[in-house]
């Protein structure tokens, strides 16, 4: 359903994605007109998400090394640049609720290198808010019956994370399910947006998310405002080869 809403194939090959990387002004306007939650800024090429989405595996890994991010290259079907991060990002750990021993080999801890760059930028925001841990449901979800050589998108391509809880250095937890306080169809960030009721936890959680939105770290940001299946997490995604942003 999301692919239809965005007007793109469920899993476009990287070559086709690159060809569509620079939509015309009219195409951008059509997308915005169809979905008010989509924006297509004229300076999209300069944004973090778009720049990261265009990186090759080697160039992306070189950037991880330049940032002193420890990682190992993984083998993951459908993923262009699969890695397993071995270090915290700006003092923030991103992990599932699996036991530490299980995380070491869990496919859900594999991420495309380009997502890791976006998460590293996001971690800088989290650090300012005193967040030291992000508990997520998954990044990579191994696809079934996947053709050899096909590059995936979203979770199939390890380009998305479903973040459910944010743990502070004081032990307090911002829980998306409990603290987001949104409504399906409501605006997530910007004028007129905000949690109802605006409890301190809800305000802090919304501030964290909307700082990431303002920084254009992810092409797709889906929240409990999008639909019921997203009631307990933020879906944060780098979408390769596009120059639009969906926030809902």
Where are these regions (language model features)?
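Catalytic cores and adjacent binding grooves of peptidoglycan-active enzymes
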Residues: 16-18, 28-38, 72, 80-86, ...
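N-terminal secretory targeting signals
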Residues: 1-70
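Residue-level "edge-of-site" marker
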Residues: 77, 139, 226
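Active-site acidic/histidine clusters and adjacent loop/turn architecture
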Residues: 46-136
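Mid-length scaffold segments of soluble, non-membrane domains
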Residues: 109-136, 142-173
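Sequence contexts marking disulfide-bonded cysteines in secreted/extracellular proteins
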Residues: 7-9, 59-61, 112-114, 188-190, ...
């Amino acid at each position: 359903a999301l692919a239809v809403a965005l007007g793109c194939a469920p899993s476009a090959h990287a070559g086709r994605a690159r060809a569509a990387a620079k939509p015309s002004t009219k195409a951008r306007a059509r997308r915005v007109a169809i979905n008010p939650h989509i924006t297509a800024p004229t300076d999209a090429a300069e944004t973090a998400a778009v720049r990261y989405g265009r990186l090759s595996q080697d160039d992306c890994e070189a950037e991880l090394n330049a940032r002193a991010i420890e990682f190992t290259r993984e083998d993951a079907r459908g993923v262009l640049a699969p890695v397993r991060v071995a270090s915290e990002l700006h003092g923030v750990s991103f992990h599932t609720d699996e036991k530490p021993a299980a995380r070491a080999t869990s496919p859900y801890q594999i991420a495309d290198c380009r997502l890791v760059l976006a998460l590293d930028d996001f971690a800088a925001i989290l650090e300012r808010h005193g967040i030291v841990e992000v508990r997520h449901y998954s990044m990579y979800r191994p696809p079934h019956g996947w053709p050899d050589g096909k590059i995936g998108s979203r979770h199939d391509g390890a380009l998305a994370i479903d973040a459910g809880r944010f743990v502070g250095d004081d032990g307090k937890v911002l829980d998306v399910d409990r603290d987001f306080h949104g409504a399906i169809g409501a605006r997530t960030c910007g004028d007129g947006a905000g949690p109802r009721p605006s409890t301190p936890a809800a305000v802090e959680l919304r501030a964290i998310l909307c700082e990431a939105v303002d920084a254009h770290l992810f092409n797709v940001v889906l929240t409990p405002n999008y639909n019921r299946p997203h009631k307990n997490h933020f879906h944060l995604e780098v979408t390769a080869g596009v120059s639009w942003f969906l926030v809902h």
